Amino acid sequence: MKNAAIGAAAVPAFGCSKGGSGASAPAGEMTMRENPKTGEKVSLLGFGCMRWPSLDGRSAREGVGEIDQNAVNELVDRAIAGGVNYFDTSPAYCRGKSERATGIALSRHPREKYFIATKLSNFAPASWTREASIGIYRNSLKELRTDYIDYMLLHGVGMGGGMEEFRARYIDNGILEFLLAERKAGRIRNLGFSYHGDIRVFDYLLSKHDVYKWDFVQIQLNYLDWKHAKQINDRNTDAEYLYGELDKRGIPAVIMEPLLGGRLSNIPHTLVPEFKRREPEMSVASWAFRFAGSFPRVLTVLSGMVKMEHLEDNLRTYSPLKELTREEFAFLEEAAERMMEFNTIPCNDCKYCMPCPYSLDIPAILLHYNKCLNERMVPESRLEPGYARARRAYLVGYDRSVPKLRQASLCTGCEQCVPHCPQRIDIPKELRRIDKYVQNLKRQAALMGDVKKKFAEGGYSCVVGNGEVYTFSRPGIEDLLDLYQNRRPLLKGALVADRAVGKAAASVLAMAGVAELYAEIITRPALEMLDALRIEVSYGKVVPHIKNRAGDGMCPMEEACRDAKTPAECLKILLSKTAAK
């Protein structure tokens, strides 16, 4: 049932309305959506306050520094000036400091100018008592400098222990009844819940809609999760189903993760030109926001905008919304299908897994792996084209993205992170897998070091490493041609160190499929040829051409290949010359 088609009612009539959802918003003005209960106009762009900037230059969710209140104020001021009026926070965000920073920034504006959404974030078992949970709620009012909450959520229902945990957090302690009473008293204007994880909890709460009268529900929705959430992680549920269940009950949807933790702003590089060809002036991220905003039951789409340029980009996207056409919706569905081929880890960078007791930067480790996977920089074998270059890019990028003392090699498998992950990733398993991969890359890099050392110490003309290390002493390209003709498998995926590599030798190496080359001397044409084929090359000196043995002209083999356009053409010339001898 969870993966079944939900019918046309749940899918927006892309391109069929008179100008779409943003038709009522003049050019440059924010698209607004109407709360069906109150009639209030809510900005289609909502401000997610999970990651306020901090004074140490990092997100306050991951850094140790204090929140940069001046930066928060500037972001809030610009958002309100741009038409944003929905601000979503939680007692759990920014190490417990988001509500205070949000309250300070918002209280500088008239209360009627904005809506506050916060959550009863009683995740720790110690906070499941009625007294502790009510204390969390009352502290939210204090921190947010308000006497009422516009949008109150049960936070992360379905996470952790599923139905059993949900009942302990909200039912058995009477907290849901308390919140319903607060709504009746007007201190909560709208009551809903945010959903992650166990679909039984989602279905149960919607089955009780006649009792609880949910005013809104917050779900994860984006063009990858629309049909592929369950494929990404079998314990997740496709957004198509979640939205459809809300739509048929007339419950407004608040959208989280429209960018899937940034993954939809950093899509595989092979897809970027197709997005840019359609909308050259728009960012790749804007497509994900247009997708989420084009569903008519969506009240607002949350975005955690720590940088002003991200805020400005999102304001452009929703001022007003340019609703997706049916053809564009089909394009995004096709793009999602192609993204699924990359098999990325479903980390959304929410950082609920942090801090790690052993100081690992878990999200950074997973996101670096995903980034390299999207860029086709996760090589598995030296036989792959561009292996050595991709290996180097992965290892260098890993050290830049994740300090050595926070890398996957230090994971102890304590599993403290596992129950906190909304995507229910087996984090220790993924960290072990990544570390195994990294260690293998390092071993391969060390093999090239062995080849270069052998070459430097032995005075050889050529050294080839491929499982074992082989040495050669004849001058010129005779050894390489002999290897190509008689022992070609030795060169496939090999690591090679050579005294002098010109266009002729480069052609032999390229056609044989070597993985990596070190040359004491290399010609510019040879370097350009190997670079075009993504073969990693290091060298001592670049020269115009290889000289003959007398030193008074060009090497005959180089001369013969001077006008050859491809490695194959050059190799054909070389083989014909050697056959003629």
Annotate each language-model stretch with its function:
Residues 65-79, 129-143, 197-206, 284-289:
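Short, acidic/polar
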Residues 29, 157-367, 371-390, 419, ...:
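Beta/alpha (TIM)-barrel catalytic core signal, keyed to glycine-rich beta->alpha loops juxtaposed to Asp/Glu
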Residues 36-41, 103-113, 141-146, 206-212, ...:
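Acidic (Asp/Glu)-rich catalytic clusters
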Residues 2-114, 178, 184:
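N-terminal binding-site loop/beta-alpha segment at the start of enzyme catalytic domains
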